[in-house]
Every structure is written in C-alpha cells, then in structure tokens.
C-alpha cells in the first residue's frame, strides 16, 4: 500500500498503516452503485448504525467491543455508539458520535471534540447522536435508506438503524442491503493490502506454532502462542473466529474449540494436528488451516491423506479464474479425494459411480470455501438469483457464484474420518459397496486433514495471500526448526 498522506489507522511498530481513504472510496462506490439503481430517488440518504458496547450478562463487566461490519466497511470507526449518514447525490458523509457525560473523562479518558473525529475519520462533518433527527430534517431527504437483510451464512437479520424521530421520515429498508453487500464482495486495492497483511502475520504465527508444537503439550498452548504472536507482532487484538486446535480425533471435529471442547486435549505421539486460526486487523479477517503430525514426521498413512488434500487444493487453485462456477471447484476437490482414497485402498470401484452416490460428502461434509473480508464468512454468497444446491456437501457451500476479479475466497478442501458419517455410509448399501471395511478400520481415530488458503481472484487466475509450508518436506523441515526456504503455490495470475 502506498504511503498514506491523509489520516490513517496505525498501531505503531511494524503494524500496517491503513489510510482512511479506504472507507471514503467505499462510500463513493456505494453512492455510485445506488445512483445507478432506478429505484433510488434523488435526495436519498443512507443511514447506518454502528455497534454498541455490551456487558457480560447482568454484570457491569464489559465485553471487548468490535465494530459492526457494515458500519466499519463504510466508516472505519472503532468507537461504539455511532451513526453514519451518506448523501447519495453528493457523497457527503456525516458521522454522529455520542455526547459523553463529564464523568467519562474520569473513568474512560479524554472526551474528544467533534473536530477530532472529523480529522480522525476523514468525514465531511461530525455531529452528536442526539442531533441526528434535527440534522436529517435540515437536509430534507426524500427517503432514508436503512439496512435490513438476511445474512445467508447465519440466517440472522442485520440490525436496521433506528433513532428517536425516525418515524417522521420516509424510510426504505429493502434497497440498501443487496447494494452494499455486492460492494463488499469486490475488494478494492486498499482492502486487498489489509488482507495481505492479515495473511502475512497469521501465516508467520502458524509457522511459529509448527516449530513449537511438542507431544505432551495442551492444544490451548498452541492457541495461546498463535494469538500472542498475532497481537504482539501484528497488533491483532481480535481473532477472526475461535481458534480450532484439534489433535488426534479432534482434528475431525470441524468446528472444534468451542466452549464444550475448548482445545483442552493433551497432544499425543502419532497424532495429526489440524489448526485452523486467523488473526484480525482493523476488522479485516484471515482464515488459515495447517495440518501436520504432532511429532514432526508423517507416517505413511498421514502422508497419503495429507498429499491427497494437497493435490485437491492445488488443482482447485490452478483451475480458478474469472467465469469459473464455484460448485464445480467443490466437485473437482471431491473427485480428487475419491481418486486418492481409492489409491489408498479405502475405496474401490468406479469413481464416476462414487460421485453419483455423493460419496465425497462422507469424507468432506463441508463446503470448499467461502468469501473472506471484514467477516471471516463474508457477505454476498447467495444474492437474489443464486440458489443453494441441495446435494450432500454442496448444500454446505457458503456461495455458489461464478468467480469474478476482486473476490477473495478461502480454498479449504479436507478429508476427515468422522465415525457417525462413516457408520451412516456403511449402513447404506448404495455407498457401502465402495468402502473397504478392513482398510477403513485402520483410519478410525485418524482424525482429519484440512488445508486452507486465502486467495484473490485476478483477471486471469488467483493471487495466493497465505504463505505457510505446505508440502510434506516443507512441513517436516519447518517443524525441525530449519529456516529452509519454501515456495508457495504459484498458479496463473
């Protein structure tokens, strides 16, 4: 990213300096898109409400604040309790900040002026939240465009802006959501620089974890090391999601690390480790998974499963380019997994017939990847007209879109040996006929392997953002403490 000449977000030391021009450009993009929409009247004004501080249940213990994602995309504001207004016709932006009581200075620090926030966030005007109705009245908007829509990953409805006096205005809450979501799908050059940075720091942290892991450690010790590196070296106070540090059978638990299974197993000799962790900088995410043997040396079975997943990962990245349909990439990964599992003797028979029986979903029940940005599962996966495919595996895809330049996605194929899925397949004659029970038994308790990369779709291929050891030789060298150079995948760009 070119040196920022205007206001910027920066945490000092070697952290990334992010120009506030990034958000000014996002607001400009949104206005340009809205002006092209025939349903948008002249005199329309966008109203966004930022996130609010919360407490732990009924106590006064604060929960660390993280800005609401749409508001961050448009304004880059780190403080809670704010609103943002954008005049669609002119692009003029107004930030509304809370009017703080004098006691705030005692407990929380200096109370800043409106001019401070105007300079800090490079907006056209700053007013107080309690003035929002009167300020908007003076602007005489034809309609207020508020944000209401369903997140297609969570199924939850985003919070629509509301304030005292909003009932006096004409409000439309259907136009804005699809337009701002589509803006977020395509990253600007400045946004890509932040995502390169989150991947750089998180990749370095994964390499430190690989070097540090030892048999006898607790999984959470590696979670702690990862988060410490990201924060101390990268200024990442937040993680993009709860760290998944699965060893042994836990490596087949897709979202391990939750409160009921808090990365608390002791790592044992012979385990595979699957560590899915990503740091977040200024609300921009990363999402990286590394799989490796706990003792630093792959067994023959571990190597076979790992290299099967590596082959599918690289085949997908080599095939990605504008116009490619994402479900076809999932199917490509599935087919390669089935071919490799047959080569290992776990499966036998026609791979085409296995595909027809949806056997791939037994070993990879999740989708191949998802959009990445300000949210780790970023918005825009299923806009109007893009339907979810109701087939095993494919129904878990978080998007079924055709790839276009500027999209950022994860590529995360995996092979897992999940007992209840294997038992279901063995009880189903249509699938059991392909399974070699004796060989399969050897892999009960193996866990799983996932390889997850973050990539940008370019005009002719992809740019790989993640930079960690991936081949068996590279991983073993890294875990042995060697500083041997490794070459990340390089596909068409």
Swiss-Prot record:
Mind telling me what this protein is named?
Xaa-Pro dipeptidase
A Pfam family recorded for this sequence: Peptidase_M24
User: N-acetylalanine: which positions carry it?
Assistant: 2
Q: What class of enzyme is it?
A: hydrolase
Q: Top-down, what is the taxonomic lineage of the species of origin? A: Eukaryota, Metazoa, Chordata, Craniata, Vertebrata
From the UniProt record, list the reaction(s) this protein catalyses: Xaa-L-Pro dipeptide + H2O = an L-alpha-amino acid + L-proline
The regulatory note on its activity is: Specifically inhibited by the pseudodipeptide CQ31. Inhibition by CQ31 indirectly activates the CARD8 inflammasome: dipeptide accumulation following PEPD inactivation weaky inhibit dipeptidyl peptidases DDP8 and DPP9, relieving DPP8- and/or DPP9-mediated inhibition of CARD8.
The record's EC number reads 3.4.13.9
> Which Gene Ontology BP terms does the record give?
amino acid metabolic process; collagen catabolic process; negative regulation of programmed cell death; proteolysis
Positions contributing to Mn(2+) 2 binding: 287, 370, 412, 452
> Which organism encodes this protein?
Homo sapiens
Q: Which sites bind a dipeptide?
A: 255, 287, 377, 398
């Amino acid at each position: 990213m070119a040196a920022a000449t205007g206001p910027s977000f920066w945490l000092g030391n070697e952290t990334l300096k992010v120009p506030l021009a990034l958000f000014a450009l996002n607001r400009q993009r949104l206005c340009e898109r809205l002006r092209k929409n025939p349903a948008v009247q002249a005199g329309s004004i966008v109203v966004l409400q930022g996130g609010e501080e919360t407490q732990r249940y009924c106590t006064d213990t604060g929960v660390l604040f993280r800005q609401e994602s749409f508001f961050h995309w448009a304004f880059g504001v780190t403080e809670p309790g704010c609103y943002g207004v954008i005049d669609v016709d002119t692009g003029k932006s107004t930030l509304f900040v809370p009017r703080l009581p004098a006691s705030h200075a005692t407990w929380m620090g200096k109370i800043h002026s409106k001019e401070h926030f105007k300079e800090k966030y490079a907006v056209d005007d700053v007013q107080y939240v309690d003035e929002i109705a009167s300020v908007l009245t003076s602007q005489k908007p034809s309609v207020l465009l508020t944000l209401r829509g369903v997140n297609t990953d969570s199924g939850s409805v985003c919070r629509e802006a509301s304030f005292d006096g909003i009932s006096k205005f004409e409000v439309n809450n259907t136009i804005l959501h699809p337009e701002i979501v589509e803006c977020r799908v395509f990253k600007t050059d400045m946004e890509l620089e932040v995502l390169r940075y989150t991947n750089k720091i998180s990749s370095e942290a994964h390499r430190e974890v690989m070097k540090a892991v030892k048999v006898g450690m607790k999984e959470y010790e590696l979670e702690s090391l990862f988060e410490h590196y990201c924060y101390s070296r990268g200024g990442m106070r937040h993680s993009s999601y709860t760290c998944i540090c699965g060893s042994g059978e836990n490596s087949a638990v897709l979202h391990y690390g939750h409160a009921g299974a808090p990365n608390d197993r002791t790592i044992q000799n012979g385990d595979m480790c699957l560590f899915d962790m990503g740091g977040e900088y200024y609300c921009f995410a990363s999402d990286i998974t590394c799989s490796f043997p706990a003792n630093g040396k792959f067994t023959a079975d571990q190597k076979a499963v790992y290299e099967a997943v590596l082959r599918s990962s690289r085949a997908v990245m080599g095939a990605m380019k504008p116009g490619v349909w994402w479900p076809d990439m999932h199917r490509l990964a599935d087919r390669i997994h089935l071919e490799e599992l047959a080569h290992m003797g776990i499966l036998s028979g026609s791979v085409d017939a296995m595909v027809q029986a949806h056997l791939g979903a037994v070993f990879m029940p999740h989708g191949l990847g998802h959009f990445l940005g300000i949210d780790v599962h970023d918005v825009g996966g299923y806009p109007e007209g893009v339907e979810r495919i109701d087939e095993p595996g494919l129904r878990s895809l978080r998007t079924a879109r055709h790839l276009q330049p500027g999209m950022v996605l994860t590529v995360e194929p995996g092979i897992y040996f999940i007992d209840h899925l294997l038992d279901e397949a063995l009880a189903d004659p249509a699938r059991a006929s392909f399974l070699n029970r004796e060989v399969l038994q050897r892999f009960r308790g193996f866990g799983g392997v996932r390889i997850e990369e973050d990539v940008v779709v370019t005009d002719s291929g992809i740019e790989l953002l993640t930079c960690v050891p991936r081949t068996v030789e590279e991983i073993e060298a890294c875990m042995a403490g060697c500083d041997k150079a490794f070459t990340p995948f390089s596909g068409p760009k």
